[in-house]
Amino acid sequence: MFRRTILLLLFSLSTGFASLKVPATDLVFRDRLWFYGQSDVPFTGVAFSISKETGNIIQQTNYIDGLAWGKYYEWWPDGAKKVNGTYRYGLMFGRWKFFFENGKILCAGSYMSGKGHKPTKGIDEIPQDGISGLWTYWDKEGRKVEEGYYTKNGIEKGNWAFWDIDGKKRLGIKIDHETFKNSIARKH
């Protein structure tokens, strides 16, 4: 019984340290790793940011051995989802979703070794570095407006699908951010 109690106590202490939660402003970036304050040990735990306006948590990042690793969350000051995704080795990896302030989804797609998402006041720019695979975009009302593939190098591949104002699917080639060969398709 005594031995089981000691093991349980040691397990509780070890998991307690592993789940350290600190304000993101207390982390220091040096030598390509994140550290808590003046510690020489790379940070393992959860860092969060709080809205000065509402007091709500607006960002949460998991770290292992000084690298962002695992789930990443970001919320608008009112608590609505803003961004969620996953980090691996400190880089954006796997499926990410970005949301408008009204809670409707803006876009969803995947990353392979993306450099990372920096919190912003708005969703002005979706990080392009490391973008890969199928990406889908919606407008503020929740209507799908664009869908297509990126190569592993982040280059748009093939024809993209666009939805016109009437909701009809059109195929076309994107010329630039605002121009398409299919002129009746609309851009998000």
Which residues does each PLM region occupy?
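Short, Lys/Arg-enriched, disordered terminal segments
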Residues: 1-5, 188
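Glycine/tyrosine- and acidic-biased, solvent-exposed loop/turn segments at the edges of beta-strands
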Residues: 16-188
